[in-house]
UniProtKB/Swiss-Prot annotation:
The keyword Nucleus applies. InterPro entries: Ribosome_biogenesis_Nop16 (IPR019002). Pfam families: Nop16. It comes from Danio rerio. This is Nucleolar protein 16. Residues 1-34, 56-79 are annotated as: Disordered. It is found in: Nucleus, Nucleolus. Residues 1-31 have a biased composition (Basic residues). Disulfide bonds: none annotated. One of its GO terms (biological process) is ribosomal large subunit biogenesis. Belongs to the NOP16 family. It comes from the Eukaryota.
């Protein structure tokens, strides 16, 4: 008993079609993914890119926005804009003004190294450079940068360390 014609043809490869070209064509036609959540929320599928950005009060590019050389005699007048969605700009400005936390940190080895150097030599970076614990032969400026990095990344820990040094010296 034979197989159905459709089931035999289903798994055959069509050599006449360029799959790479078809995939590129599909990717070009599909809608772009918008990273910014404010723009994505306010985007209208039925409008063009230029119309959407104009409604939001955004510029599609920098070309022609600002004059290269302002003329001396003419006054620069502000452009008239019909911003239909001003909340997009406000949300984007609010997000940009929020300061992100600094993710830089110090390794435990570097913290121990800096604490040893400060404990032995206080703020004398030249003496730190000559210290025998300076295995990597850091210059005074490199050591200073490491101490400043430690101060910036762990300010509470550094303050507690300095306070403990002061209490040890006073006793």
């Amino acid at each position: 008993m034979g197989k159905i014609k459709k089931s035999r043809k289903r798994n055959t490869f069509n050599y006449n079609k360029n799959k790479k070209k078809l995939k590129k064509k599909l990717r070009r036609k599909e809608k772009p993914h918008i990273e910014c959540p404010q723009i994505r929320k306010a985007w209208d599928e039925h409008k063009t890119v230029k119309q959407n950005l104009q409604d939001m009060g955004l510029a599609p590019g920098t070309k022609g926005m600002l004059p290269i050389k302002p003329k001396k005699n003419t006054k620069v007048e502000p452009m008239e804009t019909n911003v239909l969605k001003p909340y997009v700009i406000e949300e984007m400005e609010a997000e940009a003004s929020v300061r992100g936390n600094d993710r830089t940190t110090c390794s435990t080895d570097m913290i121990e190294y800096v604490q040893h150097m400060v404990k032995e030599h206080n703020e004398d970076y030249k003496a730190m450079a000559r210290d025998e614990k300076n295995y990597y032969q850091d210059t005074p400026k490199q050591i200073k940068r490491k101490v400043e990095l430690y101060k910036r990344c762990h300010p509470e820990q550094y303050a507690a360390f300095i306070a403990s040094l002061q209490s040890q010296k006073s006793t």
